């Protein structure tokens, strides 16, 4: 009984299809289907024969020519690979309704479809895929391109299961007739799924290039019926089966709208010298959808201010571009687009992807309104989208004013006074210091300094907030009066020294050198231990002058930067390396420069934290980063743990990455006199001097205890070994994977190589980074 019902259903669909074709203009939607036959290990998507007797077989994988044996009178003329699929071309001497092939060892009788379809001859055609968009969206899409570009027909690959095709076709038919559209649709379904086998449904945010946190986002289960299109051979099938005699074909998707300002895209292609026009698309987004509503074209009023992504498509006039070897998603092979400017199109992302929460599709901090999209929503779609909230007014930038450093500390007692003195001399007025779990007197010294007006000290509330110490501190800092009233803000650690190399070395000199800037990236210069193994109670900046070269692309930490920024309201909160939460409506007010005063690209405005060959600069300011200091002090640092990446050990691999002794930089010594004057003032206070001495004594005592511990003694021996000293001068010769895996992967003969030589060493990648 089930077979009878299935057969009757199939016959009804066939009759429905025939009646539509024979019914002429009364019907606007024709249904068609790709056979998608499986033969052995191969899948034959379609077989098409044209009026010259050329037969095309379209396989959804790489197929060797010898795997397909044609019948007598049918001769293979070419076997072409296209995007992982195969097109075989045969000449048929005596056309027949059925042809017997042997494919992958199995006999198969083919009844090829005649193509291209005559009802599309000399028509302006849209070529698109539908993957979940509802009929209302497709109707709006058809109406737009019919009205503004003169579209007469559309061939739409419907990615839904075949059983869903009739109801969708009926909805389209009813909508076209209701709207009075003079446009005809060929709706193509397939007997087999055509998506990527290992991807979720395309609606899943995982399939959106801009989706934030994709490295943490768990993709939905594979859904080969609704996944992004994997059978990209479809475009060549569409050409041979339907469109090779069309006047012009525009290849977009049903959530794309082609810019109408330059006239009809079809006319442009038809008069183009090459017969092809390049289409270049951007992604557009809603700001938010009204509760309980489905997304529409008119909801999409936002673009990303910093996006550089371009979607490539095309419009071709087949009669003029006869030299084309094949059609693909993003190009027509062997046809150059016209030299005039490409035509733009907008891809409306919430129509194909789940738009219930726009923040899952795109970082909302990147979205700004596009006035043209707002106008189009009202004028063309008569829609009232939810607009972006009005931006807060920016505070004026002050050339000087109060500059504040926010930092976190744990057992840093011996190094506090020099760091404080240096930055006071540079021009920082306020210091907000959070401490936690100190055992060396750091917290006592900080509390004393607060009582005497040098800084503001707070206990780190990381336990109550259930955050990492540094993140808890920065989140709490937003509510502190000294932060709220600050004109300039910087998050820096006690092993980081702002080294201003212009003018008199003060913040005023830096601001004078780049008067329009309101954000400064200060790139790290990693300073090593200069082969100094023992702790000495003396300024760090006078002891350690060996460092990484200015051009140091590896390890990736080497070119990290910290950010000094004007507290104007451009950003919402502090961050470890740079402020976070850019107010995107104000992105054009951001004047971000590097350490040489050169403008930074907008691509870093939201989340960039490290320099590159195009953006590094040290001429005006750099951040001296003394991450290791002496080997003895590093023992204490390792035991203490980290305030940000608390789950990562500061072991031999960390020392290897951060201990850089290949170059020398003494530029900060020009500022020693200013630092020393403030340090003397601090040490002239007996209570401060006593608290500092206590911290130094505890630091030395802890070093003695750790060196007596067998594990730490062995670690110290490794740190101070001739091998590790040699490696600290060879970083420029190593590939990135060496730093990820640690010094143990470097053979002894490589460690003994000449630092000045022109050699290179790397290792294969691994999944786990060594710390």
What is each residue range found by the language model?
Residues 113-131:
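Low-complexity, Pro/Ser/Thr- and charge-rich linker/hinge segments at domain boundaries
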Residues 151-152, 275, 429-430, 487, ...:
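Short acidic/polar active-site loop segments enriched in Thr and Asp
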Residues 125, 403-404:
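Cell-envelope/extracellular polymer assembly enzymes that use nucleotide-activated donors
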Residues 2-50, 54-113, 204-220, 224-228, ...:
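Catalytic-site signature of metal-activated, phosphate-bearing donor transferases
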